[in-house]
Amino acid sequence: MTNPLYKKHVISISDLTRPDMELVVATAQRLKAEPDTRLLKDKLVASCFFEASTRTRLSFETAVQRLGGNIIGFADGGNTSAKKGETLADSIKIIGSYTDAVVMRHPKEGAARLASEFSRVPVINGGDGSNQHPTQTLLDLFSIHETQGKLDGLNVAFVGDLKYGRTVHSLAQALSLFNCRFFFISPEALAMPDYICEELEEKGIQFSVHETMEEVMPELDILYMTRVQKERFDETEYKHMAAKFVLEVATLEGAKPTMKILHPLPRVDEIDVAVDKTPHAYYFQQAENGVYARQALLALVLNETV
């Protein structure tokens, strides 16, 4: 079978088709069940993190090494020639000449797309500002499939910061290809952006806006939590808004036994720690799944057949 992801840049989730996503999920399932330490043998991957990261950077590095590859790079753009004024384009040209692929996180929206225009090797976006985070979406899709046995026709709620949360933008776009039904629950000031809602309307995808989790809880298959970002509000306004979007054990009353809670992490106060002990909590397993999803993507991008 032809591998459509071979040597492909992965900058936005919209760069991937539904079959591409299904291929990554299936490959992640296989690698989780049957580890393969040879898929990146003799491959060298650059890990270029111009912005702070814990899970994304470490899971990519783990993924490369578990597949038998090698990784070089940096975790702080302040320690690179960017501090001397070197352009991103020049940096990526050089880094791409050393390696077989570049994984990059950058605080500026559009930086990953720019990097792909100057790189002779595939660029994988590890997050660019509040724009896109496609590999988070792939691990989210893998986690949803792991818990629900499918991706099609699910009821999915997004809670918290839907305006600036790049993970919810990417995931909503991806799941729209699987005819899911969406429930958006957020402060009015942090509502899902118009462009996402317009895309969903054009595709005929059902979605609705709600003030509380409780009113839709019995319908949900997936509850996707995000944090309300404190830095975007004054103290009084933040406390009022954040308190409305805290998930507690009592909030889960009436939930389907199979409903799972996801969160891109880090968690602050939006999920009470008591929820961790419920059968609905899946966010720590979700983070672990990041290794398998990123293994799958790297293997597909760097091998003609997998």
UniProtKB/Swiss-Prot annotation:
Catalyzes the condensation of carbamoyl phosphate and aspartate to form carbamoyl aspartate and inorganic phosphate, the committed step in the de novo pyrimidine nucleotide biosynthesis pathway. Carbamoyl phosphate binds at R55, T56, R105, H133, Q136, L265, P266. PANTHER family: ASPARTATE CARBAMOYLTRANSFERASE, ORNITHINE CARBAMOYLTRANSFERASE, MITOCHONDRIAL. The lineage of its organism: Bacteria, Pseudomonadati, Pseudomonadota, Gammaproteobacteria, Aeromonadales. PROSITE patterns: CARBAMOYLTRANSFERASE. L-aspartate binds at K84, R166, R227. SUPFAM superfamilies: Aspartate/ornithine carbamoyltransferase. Its EC number is 2.1.3.2. Keywords: Pyrimidine biosynthesis, Transferase. The keyword Transferase applies. One of its GO terms (molecular function) is aspartate carbamoyltransferase activity. This is Aspartate carbamoyltransferase catalytic subunit. Coiled coil: none annotated. Belongs to the aspartate/ornithine carbamoyltransferase superfamily. ATCase family. It comes from Aeromonas hydrophila subsp. hydrophila (strain ATCC 7966 / DSM 30187 / BCRC 13018 / CCUG 14551 / JCM 1027 / KCTC 2358 / NCIMB 9240 / NCTC 8049). GO terms for cellular component: cytosol. Gene3D superfamilies: Aspartate/ornithine carbamoyltransferase. Pfam families: OTCace, OTCace_N. NCBIfam families: asp_carb_tr, PRK00856.1. Heterododecamer (2C3:3R2) of six catalytic PyrB chains organized as two trimers (C3), and six regulatory PyrI chains organized as three dimers (R2). It catalyses: carbamoyl phosphate + L-aspartate = N-carbamoyl-L-aspartate + phosphate + H(+). The keyword Membrane does not apply. Pathway: Pyrimidine metabolism; UMP biosynthesis via de novo pathway; (S)-dihydroorotate from bicarbonate: step 2/3. It comes from the Bacteria. One of its GO terms (biological process) is 'de novo' UMP biosynthetic process.
